[in-house]
Regions:
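Short, well-formed alpha-helical segments that are part of the catalytic scaffolds
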Residues: 14-29
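A conserved acidic beta->alpha catalytic loop
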Residues: 25, 41-49, 89-90
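Glycine-rich, basic loop-to-helix element that forms the pyrophosphate-binding segment
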Residues: 61-77
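Short aromatic/hydrophobic "clamp" motif used to bind/position activated sugar donors
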Residues: 82
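Conserved donor NDP-sugar-binding/catalytic core segment of glycosyltransferases
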Residues: 90-123
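A recurrent flexible, glycine/aromatic-enriched loop bordering the glycosyltransferase active site
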Residues: 117-118, 129-146, 162-163, 188
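Acidic donor-binding loop at a coil-to-helix junction in glycosyltransferase catalytic cores
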Residues: 156, 163-172, 187
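Non-catalytic, C-terminal membrane-associated alpha-helical segments of glycosyltransferases
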Residues: 198, 203-210, 216-274
Length: 274
């Protein structure tokens, strides 16, 4: 049996439609003993926990939100590295292989951002994937793969932030340690086939509720200023470090990105006034 390298933490709430595919991403490496899967559920009323348990995952219950779920997951983990993902994510074999190569290397890097590609067809999906490609390794992105000692030093996710900015907030504290963070070469797949524009805006509205608390916690931090800067979110992140060349190659996709960004911005401002 190989040495245990990685704890995969999956947070769930009524994810019966997605959890099996997510767990199956790690079948081969779990059999080899390199990876363990921990599912932390928040009061699901469907078959999520049953499916996860039948597939051999360790299943725990925790609420009220995903920060607490994630913290319980990595704390229960036995491996020196932890990866935090959602149930609607699938990790391709080449990405799993790269992750295990990185976690076995014992190098200086202590955490990784993982590029995301959304499933589906049509212009909106292409535009969203185009938008996401600009965020890799920026303050708009969020670390997902951590050396466990880094999580222990930071204390993990801030459980006072209900949902939305807890990823960004943890990144601030990880980077403050002075550790090296990198972007993986390979991506994960985010299964959002059923995610309509209406649902996207509803999710953004929900996530916006903790944003004021996050800003109050880090009022003068440069990353937070960028995250809430009109210039950076609508232009800066798309043109920095030579990324403007991508816009010239795909101008129509960029127009699609901007249209959705305007709607998201409107929803955020509307909820800030409540």
């Amino acid at each position: 049996m190989a040495e245990l390298q990685l704890t995969v933490v999956i947070t769930t709430k009524n994810e019966a439609a997605n959890i099996a595919a997510c767990i199956h991403s790690f079948d081969v490496v779990r059999e080899q003993g390199k990876v363990e899967v921990i599912v932390v559920d928040n009061a699901s009323t469907d078959e999520t926990k049953k499916i996860a348990a039948e597939l051999g995952a360790a299943v725990f219950d925790k609420g009220p939100e995903r920060s607490a779920q994630r913290n319980l997951g990595w704390q229960k983990g036995r491996a020196p590295w932890a990866m935090i993902i959602d149930a609607d994510m699938i990790i391709p074999p080449e990405t799993v292989e790269e992750i295990l190569e990185k976690t076995a290397a014992r190098g200086e890097t202590a955490a990784y951002w993982i590029p995301e590609v959304r499933t589906g067809t049509g212009f909106r999906v292409k535009a969203r994937n185009f938008e996401r490609s600009f965020y890799n390794g920026t303050c708009i992105d969020a670390l997902r793969l951590f050396r466990k000692d880094v999580l222990e030093k930071t204390g993990g996710y801030d459980e006072n932030l209900i949902a939305g900015p807890e990823d960004w907030e943890l990144d601030i504290r990880v980077l403050a340690l002075g550790v090296k963070c990198e972007v993986l070469e390979h991506h994960l797949i985010h299964n959002e086939r059923q995610l309509t524009l209406k649902r996207v805006l509803e999710k953004k509205a929900y996530y916006s509720h903790s944003m004021a608390e996050y800003q109050a916690k880090w009022p003068n931090h440069s990353a937070v200023k960028k995250q809430f800067s009109f210039y950076y979110r609508y232009l800066g992140v798309f043109i920095e470090k030579g990324k403007w060349r991508k816009i010239l190659r795909h101008p129509i996709l960029f127009v699609g990105v901007m249209c959705e960004r305007v709607l998201v911005g409107f929803v955020y401002l509307k909820n800030r006034k409540k």
